[in-house]
């Protein structure tokens, strides 16, 4: 997202904004060289992620057509289909929005699209994070409680539906907190317009609570669930192998079950690793900014852009991971 003009939240400023009165500010943001590089990389990753995820969906569709009529997709492929759709949604919404916003620097699309696109952006970020949680839970249950999973055919669909519903609901506040502000640049009648959350919260701690809630739902909670599920899978596989050492011969055809479980473990670990590597720099920078807004003046702009670009790698890596392990 383009760097916004810095504003201190005080009653006078908020009153001015609520009455659409321009505010006189200092130097306004412009598109710099590092910003142009960020835009170029963003659109390159957009093309890459779109191609990868669309290709996987196409392969999945062709694979489905070759199956016998009436035979359903496996649980894992259904989950991967929804994760791919979520990643594709994030790719088609977040990346073009970020790229275009950095090009224009300010917001020209009006308050309605300011609210709607901000909502869609967060919704498309929640969806893949929650779908990763569903996959981790499902794989953990499939290995630790296989009979319970097989006897409850609706469990998977219920978790998938819940992930989409929570994504829709949790992104809802974006429609309220985002709004337009208009600033005069101090050198004439030129007006700078931006889509921001400034003055949307009565108290500073309200915004802090919302930021940490979003951070927790997008990163901390999914990460903890993935780690716990992976630990349970490792523990279960280790216990099975200790009970029957012959199952260590995973390359033999008669040991398809433990080999499939090992593949499941590798895939879930790869998902968790990709999630951590891609999103940690993004959230480290975000948390730093929440506690110290002046950090943007101390951290070089190229480093700032570089950290944010890491998040766009995740929807590119995911189709490579599940394509390698599932097809």
Curated annotation (Swiss-Prot):
Residues 1-38, 98-115, 185-211, 300-305 are extracellular. One of its GO terms (molecular function) is gonadotropin-releasing hormone receptor activity. The chain crosses the membrane at residues 39-58, 78-97, 116-137, 165-184, 212-231, 281-299, 306-325. Belongs to the G-protein coupled receptor 1 family. Disulfide bonds join 114-195. Receptor for gonadotropin releasing hormone (GnRH) that mediates the action of GnRH to stimulate the secretion of the gonadotropic hormones luteinizing hormone (LH) and follicle-stimulating hormone (FSH). This receptor mediates its action by association with G-proteins that activate a phosphatidylinositol-calcium second messenger system. Glycans are attached at residues 4, 18, 102. Residues 59-77, 138-164, 232-280, 326-327 are cytoplasmic. This is Gonadotropin-releasing hormone receptor. The lineage of its organism: Eukaryota, Metazoa, Chordata, Craniata, Vertebrata. It comes from the Eukaryota. Pituitary gland. It is found in: Cell membrane. It is a multi-pass membrane protein. GO terms for cellular component: plasma membrane. The gene is Gnrhr. InterPro entries: GPCR_Rhodpsn, GPCR_Rhodpsn_7TM, GphnRH_fam_rcpt. Keywords: Cell membrane, Disulfide bond, G-protein coupled receptor, Glycoprotein, Membrane, Receptor, Transducer, Transmembrane, Transmembrane helix.
């Amino acid at each position: 997202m383009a760097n916004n003009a810095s504003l201190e939240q005080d009653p006078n400023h908020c009153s001015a904004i609520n009455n659409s009165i321009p505010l006189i500010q200092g130097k306004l943001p412009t598109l710099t060289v590092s910003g142009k590089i960020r835009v170029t990389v963003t659109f390159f990753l957009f093309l890459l992620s779109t191609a990868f995820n669309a290709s996987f969906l196409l392969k999945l569709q062709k694979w489905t057509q070759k199956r016998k009529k009436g035979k359903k997709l496996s649980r894992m492929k259904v989950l991967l289909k929804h994760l791919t759709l979520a990643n594709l949604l994030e790719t088609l919404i977040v990346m073009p929005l970020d790229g275009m916003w950095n090009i224009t620097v300010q917001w020209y699309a009006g308050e309605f699209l300011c609210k709607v696109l901000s909502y869609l952006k967060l919704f498309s970020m929640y969806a893949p994070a929650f779908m990763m949680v569903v996959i981790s839970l499902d794989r953990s249950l499939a290995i630790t409680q296989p009979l319970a999973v097989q006897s409850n055919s609706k469990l998977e669909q219920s978790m998938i539906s819940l992930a989409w519903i929570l994504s829709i609901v949790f992104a809802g506040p974006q429609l309220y907190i985002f709004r337009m502000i208009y600033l005069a640049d101090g050198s004439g009648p030129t007006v700078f317009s931006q889509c921001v959350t400034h003055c949307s919260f009565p108290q500073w701690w309200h915004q802090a609570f919302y930021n940490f809630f979003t951070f927790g739902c997008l990163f901390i909670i999914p990460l903890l669930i993935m780690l716990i599920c992976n630990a349970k899978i490792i523990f279960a596989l280790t216990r099975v192998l200790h009970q029957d050492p012959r199952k260590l011969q995973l390359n033999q055809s008669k040991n398809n079950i433990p080999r499939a479980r090992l593949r499941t473990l590798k895939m879930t670990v790869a998902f968790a690793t990709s999630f951590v590597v891609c999103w940690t720099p993004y959230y480290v920078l975000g948390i730093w900014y929440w506690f110290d807004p002046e950090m943007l003046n101390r951290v070089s702009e190229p480093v700032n852009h570089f950290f944010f670009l890491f998040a766009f790698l995740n929807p590119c890596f995911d189709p490579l991971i599940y394509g390698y392990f599932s097809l």
